[in-house]
Amino acid sequence: MRQVCSLLFFCLISLGVAAQDNASSQQCAPDGIAVGGFDLVSYHQASGPLPGDTGFAHQIGELTYLFSSADNLQTFLSDQQRYLPTYQGFCAATLAMGRLACPDYSNFKIENGRLLLFELAGFTNGRSLWNSDPVGFRQRADANFQTLVK
């Protein structure tokens, strides 16, 4: 019975991963507004994430990033790579586990100066999982990102 359950679990995970081929951060932004409309620069400030304003917007590809002020927009434009979310905005912890999930944009961590976003669903807190083994989760997420997203 245990072998059957393990095989079934593996098959379900494999199907989920296969269905995510050619994934893009667009799937977490069906309306084209990235990061749930939150200001990327504000994640790095004491205030924490602030809602962006359409008056301070910047487009990258098909995604529009909103900022809460002209100053934050200019800060972003001066160093975009610093402020763009790691793993194109997918949940870092679930990516480490081999699947893609859209995060809860209020569940985040700044690690080594980079924004990590995490799922928060029911009893699953991606940030807590990540914090239990940040080095291991980072290694697995980096490896999975190469195959699942890029």
Where are these regions (language model features)?
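Mature extracytoplasmic domains of secretory-pathway proteins
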Residues: 66-68, 72-85
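Sec-dependent N-terminal signal peptides
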Residues: 4-13
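Intrinsically disordered, low-complexity terminal tails and linkers in eukaryotic proteins, enriched
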Residues: 20-61, 82-150
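Compositionally biased, low-structure terminal segments
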Residues: 10-11, 77, 84, 146
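N-terminal signal peptide c-region/cleavage motif recognized by signal peptidases
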Residues: 14-18
